[in-house]
Amino acid sequence: LLIDNKEIKDVRLDLVFVSQEVDLFDLSVRDNLCLGKEIPDKKIFELLEEAGLKGWYNELPNGLDTIVGERGIKLSTGQKQRLNLIRGILIDKELYFFDEPTSNLDILSEEKITNMIEKYLKDKTYVIVTHRQKLKSLCNKHYIFENHEMREELSETSILN
């Protein structure tokens, strides 16, 4: 596997990992999303709306300062997944690795997340591990991995089947 024409094992990876298992810190929504970076609230609101979380956000008692996590407001798995994607976008690296990023989302939410990946990461490199057809459509190369090894590259025809 090559990144910028170098073997992946020889490249120091500066990447964002967006997992299907989301851990939120016992911190505010803002702190969970920004991880210490100064991000304008306007940008955060834009991403929350695009991810379909505007209604949820509007009901938070303290807005972006509302504490979430084990000691705060409890979130559904789907809400956590969408916040995790927003966090990944805000981290802003060149390489992204997604592990089933829409596994707990309904079709409408998956569509929103797919649109966000397409919009915000269009000039980035990303790898998506998924079984979902919609996410597969974002990728220009498709591989089957079996027993921890890359078995084959798939053609567009076999992806659709």
Where are these regions (language model features)?
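ABC nucleotide-binding domain signature
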Residues: K9, L13-Q20, V127
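ABC ATPase nucleotide-binding domain helical subdomain, centered on the C-loop/LSGGQ "ABC signature"
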Residues: R30-E70, T114-N115, D123
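ABC ATPase nucleotide-binding domain "signature" region
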Residues: S76-T77, L83-G88, I128
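A short, proline-enriched helix->beta-strand linker immediately N-terminal to the Walker B motif
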Residues: L90-E94, D123
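Catalytic Walker B motif of ABC-type/P-loop ATPase nucleotide-binding domains
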Residues: Y96-E100
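Helix N-cap at the start of a conserved alpha-helix in ABC-type nucleotide-binding domains
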Residues: I107-L108
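Conserved catalytic loops of ABC-family nucleotide-binding domains
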Residues: E118-T130, K136
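H-loop (His-switch) and adjacent beta-strand-loop-beta switch element
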Residues: H131-R132, L138-S155
